[in-house]
Amino acid sequence: MSVDSPAEQRAFVDSNIWLYALIAKQDPAKSELAARIIALPQIVSVQVINEVCVNLLRKGRRSEGEIAEVIRAFHSRHHVAPLNEDVMLRAVELRRTCSFSYWDSLIVAAALSAGATVLYSEDLQHQQLVDSSLRIINPFLNP
């Protein structure tokens, strides 16, 4: 998979991609590709940061100090999309129209509200186009 430059896309990255990059022992090939994706400035949401942190504590056995550094890094290097009333109400509409789960609808709504054109996720339908503007991509599938 080729990773486009930030000038060519505004990408939102789901927590599963971050976790492959941050917990390298899971799958070395996926970890390498995920690391390339997150090396570029990306869009994340508060929900993604929370999911990454809880998994780093549980599975990655990271210390609270390391978690604090992860949080700082997210906020200093990437655009953090808020989880506010507008995003939550858009998620309701997405559940109605696209049949996303509750948590997935919040991810998609945050990506849309932040102006993302690509959503990297292993958990959603590859190549799905949402609202004619957001393409869901599973970067681990062969093109």
PLM features: residue spans?
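Short, well-structured N-terminal submotif of metal-dependent ribonuclease cores
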Residues: 1-44, 59-69, 143
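Acidic catalytic patch
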Residues: 47-50, 72, 77-97
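Conserved glycosyltransferase catalytic-site signature
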Residues: 15, 85, 104-105
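Acidic, PIN/NYN-like endoribonuclease modules and their adjacent C-terminal/linker elements
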Residues: 1-6, 108-143
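Glycine-rich anion/phosphate-binding loops
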Residues: 100
